[in-house]
Swiss-Prot record:
Annotated PANTHER family: PTERIN-4-ALPHA-CARBINOLAMINE DEHYDRATASE-RELATED
Name of the featured protein: Putative pterin-4-alpha-carbinolamine dehydratase
Keyword set includes Amino-acid biosynthesis: no
Top-level EC class: lyase
Record has Ribosomal protein as a keyword: no
Amino acid sequence: MSNLHELKCEACHIDAPKVTDLELEEMLQGISQWRVIERDGIKQLEREFTFKNFKLAWAFSNKIAELAEAEFHHPTITLEWGKVTVCWWSHSAKGLHKNDFICAAKTDRCLE
């Protein structure tokens, strides 16, 4: 699914459906540089971004924070010298929801 960045997140509740394995594979094709990890039994999308210095990494982190506020969906952002790691997952669903893939695709667009 290559148009994920054009979609808008929907309200996610505790009973929101997690993506199926088939949906996961399909949506991963649109965000090929992301990987699925499992932390504390919860699937998450993770990607590391590298930069030439801390200031560029910091600026990118701020763009992700603005994206998160606009979508009302919030990731874990780890800022280091020359590197930002972003993890998306749906806290209320305790796993991966379509919102996570939408935000991952929009995160990739923040590099442009």
